[in-house]
């Protein structure tokens, strides 16, 4: 049986429903960006028993990263498959500044979603409270990078207006991490990036547009790219076939 409310009450019911959804959206945004704390990062990477960053992210030693530069996707796949990790490889990338040397690094993640005004307002408010007022949200995660990190961004495959970085932010990424960039989305200013010696980006596309209508909802949180689950502290290893994301304890 269908219920029918009096017409004069309908608008108030809609308002109440909207307010409830807004509250849920704000809480969801802060659950990832504001309160995904050190303890939660340790919990989701509990098999790692080595050194960790201040925020709880696993820190695989440099000597291990160096050895992984010679590992092929097939070799990594065999080990991962044997341990039950069947969804750690993602292919079909475009490479900006391709080179023979493979990118290997400790993953720092960023999660973006299509912009929603109510949630984005609260994210920007929190950013302002933290002093992040002079640059866009895409720069927030770049500020966290350390040498040996590799930034992995889920821009939900957005190409037009999904350009996470141009040559200026690419320079900032390389200056801080001495490493590259992986984006499930796009970049711009490729001609400028070609002048950054040692920098490389793996992207799903390129576009001249500026980043627009997206919001950052998580830094160093679990993300998904294609059929791959990626955690902060994983080790990203590139080769001509694509990118393998290796759990740190393996």
Tell me the role of every PLM-derived stretch.
Residues 235, 241-244:
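Channel- or pocket-lining gating/hinge segments that regulate access to a cavity or pore
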Residues 71-75, 80-232, 245-250:
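Feature captures the catalytic cores and cofactor-binding loops of soluble hydro-lyases/lyases
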Residues 32-77, 81:
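N-terminal pre-domain segments of enzymes
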Residues 1-11:
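N-terminal secretory signal peptides that target proteins for export/translocation
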Residues 56, 173, 234-236:
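Buried hydrophobic positions in well-ordered alpha/beta secondary-structure cores of metabolic enzymes
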Residues 15-27:
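Bacterial N-terminal signal peptides
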Residues 27-31, 248-250:
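Short, intrinsically disordered, charge-balanced linker/junction segments flanking boundaries
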């Amino acid at each position: 049986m269908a219920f029918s409310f009096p017409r004069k009450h309908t608008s108030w019911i809609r308002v109440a429903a909207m307010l409830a959804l807004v509250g849920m959206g704000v809480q969801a945004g802060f659950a990832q960006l504001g309160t995904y704390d050190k303890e939660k990062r340790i919990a989701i990477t509990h098999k790692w028993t080595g050194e960790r960053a201040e925020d709880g992210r696993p820190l695989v030693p440099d000597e291990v990263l160096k050895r992984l530069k010679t590992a092929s996707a097939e070799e990594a796949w065999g080990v991962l498959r044997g341990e039950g990790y069947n969804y750690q490889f993602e292919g079909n990338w475009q490479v900006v500044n391709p080179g023979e040397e493979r990118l290997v690094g400790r993953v720092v993640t960023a999660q973006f979603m299509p912009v929603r005004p109510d949630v984005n307002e609260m994210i920007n408010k929190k950013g302002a409270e933290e002093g992040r007022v002079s640059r866009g949200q895409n720069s927030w995660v770049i500020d966290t990078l350390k040498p040996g990190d590799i930034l992995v961004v889920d821009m939900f495959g957005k190409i037009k207006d999904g350009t996470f970085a141009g040559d200026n932010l690419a320079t900032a990424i390389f200056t801080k991490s001495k490493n590259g960039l992986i984006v499930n989305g796009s970049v711009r200013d490729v001609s400028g990036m070609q002048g950054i010696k040692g920098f490389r980006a793996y992207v799903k596309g390129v576009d001249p547009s500026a980043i627009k209508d997206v919001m950052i909802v998580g830094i160093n949180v679990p993300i998904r790219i294609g059929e791959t689950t990626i955690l902060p502290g994983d080790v990203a290893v590139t080769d001509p076939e694509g990118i393998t994301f290796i759990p740190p304890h393996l």
